[in-house]
């Protein structure tokens, strides 16, 4: 099983490799990837250094080209494919059908993965991507249960990648319109959920307020940790009560499901967080490396260590974790 870790910078990439990542995924410094924030991601020169470092240590580098090409501007996405291949990436993670077609026809030897943004949630969809574009792996959305993941593993021979830890999204990735509704821009087109140019913070007599395109998303009291203002994780007044009406900030943590993921034949476990710091990458990579190694050394004796959970909780969104949709009773 591959441990796939995020990097939004060269220091984060080196940290991931040094702490046991089998592969690292990154993006270019533009809107062709779904973590397009100021100060994040890689220029070609930085990416060249990243490739060298990863390959010197016997690991792999995946490049996310996982937004959808704008009308009349698809050349930029095709060029991203060209650059990724030329710079020596081991795999390209792509969502857009036309970009997949371009990559598969121009670079048939390149390993292609279907991005979570493509929202492939059934065996027929996965077979389509395999037959049309010869994809080797599909990244599954975080809304599937373990029962559904197992079902897909039985019905396809395409490698499956699942999110194992990190920020949790309650939407089927690739299908969310909340950011578009609020700002006119979506992660699928500009590469950012709640684009930074629409974010504003303001100290008021009532507390620290976070706004997205002038709409109040949350208000924080003294000493309360403030989160990045995403619409789905805001607190809103409903019937006279103020609470997280859509989703409470929390992180996915599937350490307890590791035996099931192994037995299901999941090819790769993915850590979310290209927008997070090298310190986050270090902590999470180290814990997950230890857990995977412990299971492989003695599957029968595998147990989640309390210190693993404690270390992950410290870097979790909202300082709490959940199994998310993986453990839901309804299918």
Regions found by a protein language model. Name each.
Residues 1-120, 139, 143, 147-268, ...:
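Active-site pocket-lining/capping segments in soluble small-molecule metabolic enzymes
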Residues 122-124:
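Conserved nucleotide-cofactor-binding alpha/beta core module
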């Amino acid at each position: 099983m591959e441990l796939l870790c995020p990097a939004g910078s060269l220091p984060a990439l080196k940290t991931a490799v040094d702490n046991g990542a089998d592969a690292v995924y990154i993006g270019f410094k533009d809107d062709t990837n779904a973590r397009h924030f100021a100060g994040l991601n890689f220029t070609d020169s930085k990416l060249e250094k990243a490739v060298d470092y990863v390959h010197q240590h016997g690991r792999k580098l995946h490049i996310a080209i996982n937004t959808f090409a704008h009308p009349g501007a698809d050349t930029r996405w095709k060029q991203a494919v060209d650059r990724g291949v030329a710079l020596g990436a081991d795999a390209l993670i792509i969502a857009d059908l036309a970009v997949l077609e371009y990559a598969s026809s121009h670079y048939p030897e390149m390993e292609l993965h279907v991005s979570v943004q493509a929202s492939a949630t059934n065996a027929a969809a996965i077979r389509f991507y395999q037959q049309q574009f010869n994809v080797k792996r599909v990244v599954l959305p975080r809304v599937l249960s373990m029962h559904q993941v197992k079902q897909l593993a039985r019905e396809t021979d395409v490698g499956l990648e699942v999110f194992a830890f990190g920020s949790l999204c309650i939407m089927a990735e690739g299908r969310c319109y909340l950011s578009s509704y609020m700002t006119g821009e979506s992660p699928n087109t500009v590469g950012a959920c709640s684009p930074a140019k629409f974010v504003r913070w303001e100290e008021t007599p009532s507390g620290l307020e976070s706004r997205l395109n002038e709409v109040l998303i949350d208000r924080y009291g003294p000493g309360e940790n403030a989160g990045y203002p995403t619409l789905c994780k805001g607190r809103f007044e409903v019937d006279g009560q103020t609470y997280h009406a859509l989703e409470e900030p929390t992180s996915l943590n599937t350490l307890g499901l590791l035996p099931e993921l192994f037995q299901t034949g999941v090819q790769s476990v993915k850590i979310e967080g290209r927008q997070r710091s090298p310190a986050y990458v270090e902590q999470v990579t180290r814990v997950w490396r230890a857990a995977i190694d412990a299971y492989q050394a003695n599957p029968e004796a595998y147990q989640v260590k309390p210190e693993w959970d404690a270390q992950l909780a410290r870097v979790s969104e909202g300082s709490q974790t959940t199994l998310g949709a993986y453990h839901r009773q309804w299918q």
